A protein has these predicted regions:
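Bacterial N-terminal signal peptides
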Residues: 11-23
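Flexible, small-residue-rich N-terminal segments that precede or flank a structured functional core
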Residues: 28-83, 119, 204-207, 217-226, ...
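Beta-strand-rich interaction/scaffold domains
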Residues: 102-187
Length: 287
């Protein structure tokens, strides 16, 4: 539970907000809608060979039926965040994908943050069985075929899902914003070298639970995997929360009104607006 501000802070917050009301405005949020720049399916083999779907129209997650060997599929997607200015604060992130074929009912599809790089080659096939990998394709065993293998077959990713969505019939699905998705994208924006995207993991315990999603190669651009990112631009100095070039009582009012929560007033990005953030604001005071 977030710590509650003291009576002194509550009173100061009310006073500051009241004084700042005529001229205060929080930093304006911007929105970026980004389509995937790479998406592949990791195909678990049952014959010792490697299979890939680097340039296919679809990506898959879940477990296939007995005709496909009962093996697993995991969909990996990555987004280019360069359209979002460095230093921005991420406020919300949602992921949208179009599920275009299924033989099963509702099953959870989970997004896990990837922990290793991977490639997308030119391999193409219809269906989820895949084909022989091309150079730099990601497969179940290789993150870059044929030169580099995953530390763990099936991809290396955070065990805890960042977001979960129940996927049933054909249609669009949105993984709504949650703190873990925001944290993932903020980390990628702050350190682009670790932007390895997410892996979509379906129901891997039951046969015939695989879900087919349209990939970035789909002819229908509206079906491409997409993220919608809401963010605020970095202030000229930590503490200029309304972007007016000054750090004064107006900004203090905004910070104190957000006390105990998150958002742009979390100047040190530790997940909570508290005394540490107030200290940063005061150290940069510029009325």
């Amino acid at each position: 539970m977030a710590p509650r501000p003291s009576r002194h802070h509550v009173g100061l917050a009310a006073l500051a907000v009241a004084c700042a009301a005529p001229c205060a405005s929080t930093a304006v949020a911007d929105t970026a809608v980004l389509r995937s720049v790479a998406d592949v399916t990791l195909i678990q083999p049952n014959d010792g060979l490697q299979y890939a779907l680097g340039a296919a129209y679809n990506i898959y997650c879940g477990r296939v039926g007995v005709n496909g060997g009962g093996t697993l599929r995991r969909a990996v997607v990555r987004f280019d965040l360069s359209a979002i200015p460095a230093g921005s604060t991420i406020l919300s992130v949602s992921y949208k994908a179009y599920m275009s074929q299924t033989n099963s009912g509702a099953n959870d599809c989970k997004l896990h943050r990837m922990l290793a790089p991977w490639g997308e080659g030119t391999s193409f096939a219809f269906g989820g069985g895949g084909t022989s990998p091309e150079v730099n394709d990601a497969t179940w065993t290789y993150n870059f075929w044929p030169t580099s293998t995953w530390a763990v077959p099936g991809g290396v990713f955070v065990p805890t899902a960042s977001a979960t969505k129940s996927v049933n019939a054909v249609g669009f699905y949105t993984w709504a914003t949650v703190p873990a998705l925001v944290a993932d994208v903020q980390a990628w924006l702050d350190t682009p070298a670790v932007n390895y995207g997410w892996v979509m993991v379906g129901n891997e315990a039951t046969l015939e639970t695989a879900k087919r999603f349209d990939a970035r190669e789909s002819s229908d651009i509206t079906h491409h995997p997409t993220i919608t990112v809401v963010y605020t631009l970095a202030s000229a100095a930590p503490g200029d929360l309304n972007g007016d070039g000054k750090i004064n009582g107006v900004d203090m009012g905004i910070l104190l009104a957000a006390w105990g929560g998150t958002g742009p007033a979390d100047l040190n990005r530790d997940g909570i607006v508290d005394g540490a953030d107030l200290g940063l604001l005061l150290s940069n005071w510029k009325p």
